[in-house]
């Protein structure tokens, strides 16, 4: 049987206080750098997330604005069509009969010496009540000018809103970055 080796007592190498402090400071420095890099990555990730959210909101806003513009355009087009549309089929039939009657009278070889006063009165009445192209034109020009002014105002408002949203988002991101960054040490 072999005898086990006898244990020898070894004394640990002498540790100097200065070497230990340098090592601790170096480890603390490495830990601080690791935290700073981790915080930087975290801030960058959060900023990218906020930018993505902002871009999504901007796209949604532009899509909704486009829908609103198309809706306004369709409304204006419908108003223009309604202004030109004859409202009653009976009026169209009556106008066709009147035109046929006038055509037959004008197309005949017999020329009346005087016009029938009832026809003249009825024609004047129609001209005064239903056929007002100048009034319609003035009204349509006025509505067009109002629509143009409203469109300019809407464009100005949208530009202001976009600028305000952009500045607000930038300020919010700046505040978020300031909150996430480690506090700066000031030397006083």
From Swiss-Prot:
The keyword Kinase is assigned to this record: no
Subcellular location field: Cytoplasm, Cytoskeleton, Spindle
GO biological process: cell division; mitotic spindle assembly; mitotic spindle organization; mitotic spindle-templated microtubule nucleation; regulation of mitotic nuclear division
Main location: cytoplasm
Cysteines joined through disulfide linkages: none
GO cellular component entries: cytoplasm; HAUS complex; microtubule; spindle
Coiled coil: 141-163
Record keywords, A-Z: Cell cycle, Cell division, Coiled coil, Cytoplasm, Cytoskeleton, Microtubule, Mitosis
Domain of life: Eukaryota
Subunit structure: Component of the augmin complex composed of dgt2, dgt3, dgt4, dgt5, dgt6, msd1, msd5 and wac. The complex interacts directly or indirectly with microtubules and is required for centrosome-independent generation of spindle microtubules.
Function: As part of the augmin complex, plays a role in centrosome-independent generation of spindle microtubules. The complex is required for mitotic spindle assembly through its involvement in localizing gamma-tubulin to spindle microtubules.
Comment field (misc): The name 'dim gamma-tubulin 4' derives from the decreased gamma-tubulin staining of the spindle pole seen following RNAi-mediated knockdown of dgt4 in S2 cells.
Protein's UniProt name: Augmin complex subunit dgt4
The organism of origin for this protein: Drosophila melanogaster (Fruit fly)
Taxonomic placement: Eukaryota, Metazoa, Ecdysozoa, Arthropoda, Hexapoda
Gene name tied to this protein: dgt4
């Amino acid at each position: 049987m072999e005898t086990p080796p006898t244990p020898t007592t070894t004394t640990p190498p002498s540790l100097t206080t200065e070497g230990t402090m340098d090592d601790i400071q170096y480890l603390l420095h490495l830990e601080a750098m690791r935290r700073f890099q981790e915080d930087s990555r975290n801030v960058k990730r959060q900023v990218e997330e906020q930018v993505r959210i902002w871009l999504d909101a901007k796209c949604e806003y532009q899509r909704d604005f486009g829908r609103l513009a198309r809706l306004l355009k369709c409304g204006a087009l419908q108003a223009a069509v309604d202004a030109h549309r004859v409202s009653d089929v009976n009026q169209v039939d009556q106008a066709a009969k009147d035109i046929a009657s006038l055509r037959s009278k004008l197309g005949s070889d017999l020329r009346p010496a005087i016009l029938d006063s009832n026809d003249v009165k009825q024609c004047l009445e129609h001209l005064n009540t239903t056929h007002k192209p100048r009034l319609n034109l003035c009204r349509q020009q006025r509505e067009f000018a109002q629509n143009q002014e409203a469109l300019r105002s809407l464009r100005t408002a949208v530009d202001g809103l976009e600028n305000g949203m952009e500045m607000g988002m930038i300020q919010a991101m700046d505040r978020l970055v300031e909150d996430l960054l480690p506090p700066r040490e000031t030397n006083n």
